């Protein structure tokens, strides 16, 4: 009740939504998160489906199809493909922009940002700036799971630490890219971990 009261006092009772299409460009991933039912990477060969890595033309086709169906945004995410570089991510954004100058591109988790900038040997700021210049509009705050390192050590030990994740999000804001933030719960966390995540 208190949370709703704060929300109403801050934002009123208006509710909005976005018509969005999620485009997963690859399910090939070098990470091995314990909870993932999506990845076709290490230790995940038994999961349903085959590995895929879709082409730029397919990303464009799906974007154009989304626009025809009334979407105003595409969200792009995928596994951390071992052969992807930062240029791969930039080129995906450019491919979409070659097809539409108006669709909102909401793409790449902090984990993808970290992977991309490392492959190019540049800072997080520089990489995010290049993505924005290519046409990126905002970042999804995924790969957050629970922003508590005790939990992350159990469910995703090879992912970014809580502080690393937060620094990438803060840097995105400095570049002028708004972000969201997600929380995955119902696994090994307790309510103090959830509270800590929300406070961050």
Q: Where do the model's predicted regions map?
A:
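Active-site loop-helix segments enriched in His/Asp/Glu that coordinate
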Residues: 45-61, 81-98, 123
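Short, well-ordered coil/turn segments that N-cap beta-strands
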Residues: 9, 13-15, 70-72, 100-105, ...
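Active-site mouth loops of central-metabolism enzymes
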Residues: 21, 39-57, 111-123, 154-158, ...
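Catalytic cores of alpha/beta
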Residues: 122-128, 188-200
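Active-site-adjacent beta->alpha loops and helix N-cap segments on the catalytic face
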Residues: 82-96, 100, 150-165
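Generic structural signal for well-ordered alpha-helices
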Residues: 60-63, 89-94, 128-129, 166-169, ...
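N-terminal pre-triad scaffold of radical SAM enzymes
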Residues: 2-43, 51-77, 139
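Conserved strand-turn element in the central/C-terminal portion of the radical SAM core barrel
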Residues: 74-84, 105-116, 147-149, 156-157, ...
């Amino acid at each position: 009740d208190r949370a709703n009261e704060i929300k109403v006092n801050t934002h009123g009772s208006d509710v909005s939504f976005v018509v969005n299409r999620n485009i997963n460009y690859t399910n090939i991933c070098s990470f091995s998160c314990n909870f993932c039912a999506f990845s076709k990477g290490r230790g995940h060969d038994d999961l349903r489906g085959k590995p895929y890595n879709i082409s730029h033309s397919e990303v464009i086709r799906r974007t154009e199809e989304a626009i025809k169906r009334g979407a105003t945004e595409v969200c792009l995410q995928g596994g951390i493909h071992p052969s992807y570089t930062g240029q791969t991510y930039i080129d995906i954004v450019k491919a979409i922009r070659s097809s539409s100058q108006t669709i909102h591109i909401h793409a790449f988790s902090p984990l993808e940002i970290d992977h991309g900038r490392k492959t190019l040997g540049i800072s997080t700021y520089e990489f995010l700036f290049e993505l924005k210049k290519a046409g990126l509009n905002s970042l999804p705050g995924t790969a957050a799971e629970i922003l508590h390192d005790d939990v992350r050590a159990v469910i995703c030990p090879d992912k970014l630490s809580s502080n690393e994740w937060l620094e990438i999000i803060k840097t995105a804001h400095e570049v002028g890219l708004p972000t969201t933030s997600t929380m995955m719960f119902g696994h090994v966390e307790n309510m103090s971990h959830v509270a800590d995540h929300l406070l961050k």
